[in-house]
Curated annotation (Swiss-Prot):
Gene3D superfamilies: 1.10.8.1160
Keyword Transferase annotated: no
Domain of life: Bacteria
Protein's organism: Vibrio cholerae serotype O1 (strain ATCC 39315 / El Tor Inaba N16961)
UniProt protein name: Antitoxin protein TsiV3
Keywords, in A-Z order: Disulfide bond, Signal
Length: 122
């Protein structure tokens, strides 16, 4: 049963990466399909993305018009959207929820970088 679950999670990760969804960095490739290792790796990637976004916003907030609560509101919206995956249940739902949050945070980071670039070039 454990091997079946491990194979399923590995296939899920492969499908997510093929489908163009954000997948945790290459560092997560050595997790060997172990759910807890995959989850921790994705959560570490989420933490890195959060730190990068907060640093970009805080260093640019005055010049670029970011409201004080911009990040917290965006992060809450991401979390609420991704919580839908919990309804899937079990380890699969937990993994999908975390992967969703990582993907959406990476999208938010790209959006913020583009916003800053647009303001700089206007």
């Amino acid at each position: 049963m454990n091997n079946l679950l491990s194979a399923y999670v590995t296939m899920l990760l492969i499908l997510l990466s093929i489908s163009g969804g954000a997948i945790a960095s290459e560092n997560c490739n050595d997790t060997s399909g172990v759910h807890q290792k995959i989850l921790v790796c994705i959560q570490n990637e989420i933490a890195k993305s959060e730190t990068q976004i907060r640093n970009n916003i805080s260093s640019k907030s005055i010049d670029y018009g970011f409201p004080d609560d911009f990040y917290s509101k965006q992060r809450l919206a991401i979390h609420e959207k991704c919580m839908l995956y919990i309804n899937v249940g079990g380890q699969r739902g937990e993994l999908l929820m975390n992967q969703c949050e990582l993907s959406m945070l990476q999208g938010l980071d790209i959006y913020i970088q583009q916003y800053i670039e647009d303001v700089d070039n206007s």
